[in-house]
């Protein structure tokens, strides 16, 4: 199996220039599905910390580059929306976040905020023993005892060890949200109205945009609940 893919075929969210070279690195299997960006692309093309795959591998051997609190050894490890990228030796911390063009970008955050990660709940399943399993947007799962406390489309902030939910943001009218895909990717605002669509069609969401008087509309799938500290580099709690 090849470790490369054509640049023209990569998802629009990848932060690569499509016309520079014919091929780019292919992500390994892991979280975020097809949207996952190989760590090498972030280190080389976005941050400029390495010039080659060889340099990336050497940097990773030092165990000082972490994703969501865990040291990474594979330069093809996929990273994606809301992942936390930490460089311990540099004391630099970033949250991966879609910009207004829909590409994944790096938002600097402080060390405290780097200790946990936001996830959108995309599914709930009851499992043996009576607990409820929450499925998050990146493929991760989490067991909770109180099934009624969390709903699909809510957001939770989970500690990097996965053992504690440190914040919970409810999906409802009046909630602060960001659009993560589509024509309005990267925009932030407050939900004005959730338009429930009968049948299997997607619900629409009307959002009052932050910092201007505009309102925009997107589908529920593209909306993630955040809080006021989420985009300024502070802690989510």
Curated annotation (Swiss-Prot):
One of its GO terms (cellular component) is cytosolic small ribosomal subunit. CDD domains: KOW_RPS4. InterPro entries: Rib_uL2_dom2, Ribosomal_eS4, Ribosomal_eS4_central_region, Ribosomal_eS4_central_sf, Ribosomal_eS4_KOW, Ribosomal_eS4_N, Ribosomal_eS4_N_CS, S4_RNA-bd_sf. Residues 37-99 form the S4 RNA-binding domain. GO terms for molecular function: rRNA binding; structural constituent of ribosome. The keyword tRNA processing does not apply. Pfam families: Ribosomal_S4e, RS4NT. GO terms for biological process: translation. It comes from the Archaea. Keywords: Ribonucleoprotein, Ribosomal protein, RNA-binding, rRNA-binding. The keyword Heme does not apply. Belongs to the eukaryotic ribosomal protein eS4 family. NCBIfam families: PRK04313.1. This is Small ribosomal subunit protein eS4. It comes from Natronomonas pharaonis (strain ATCC 35678 / DSM 2160 / CIP 103997 / JCM 8858 / NBRC 14720 / NCIMB 2260 / Gabara) (Halobacterium pharaonis).
């Amino acid at each position: 199996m090849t470790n490369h893919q054509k640049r023209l075929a990569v998802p629009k969210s990848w932060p690569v220039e499509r016309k520079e070279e014919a091929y780019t690195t292919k992500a390994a299997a892991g979280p975020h599905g097809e949207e996952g960006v190989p760590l090498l692309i972030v280190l080389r093309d976005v941050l400029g910390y390495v010039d080659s795959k060889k340099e990336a591998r050497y940097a990773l051997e030092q165990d000082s580059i972490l994703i969501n609190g865990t040291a990474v050894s594979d330069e093809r490890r996929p990273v994606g929306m809301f992942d936390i990228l930490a460089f311990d030796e540099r004391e630099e911390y970033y949250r991966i976040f879609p910009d207004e063009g829909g590409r994944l970008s790096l938002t600097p955050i402080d060390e405290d905020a780097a200790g946990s990660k936001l996830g959108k709940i995309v599914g709930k399943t009851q499992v043996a023993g009576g607990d409820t399993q929450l499925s998050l947007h990146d493929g991760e799962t989490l067991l909770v005892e109180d099934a009624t406390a969390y709903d699909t489309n809510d957001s939770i902030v989970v500690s990097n060890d996965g053992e504690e939910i440190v914040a919970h943001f409810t999906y409802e009218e009046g909630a602060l949200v960001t659009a993560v895909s589509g024509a309005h990717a990267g925009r932030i605002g407050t939900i004005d109205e959730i338009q429930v669509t009968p049948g299997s069609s997607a619900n629409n969401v009307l959002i009052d945009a932050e910092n201007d008087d505009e309102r925009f509309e997107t589908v529920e799938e593209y909306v993630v609940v955040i809080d006021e500290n989420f985009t300024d580099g502070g802690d989510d709690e």
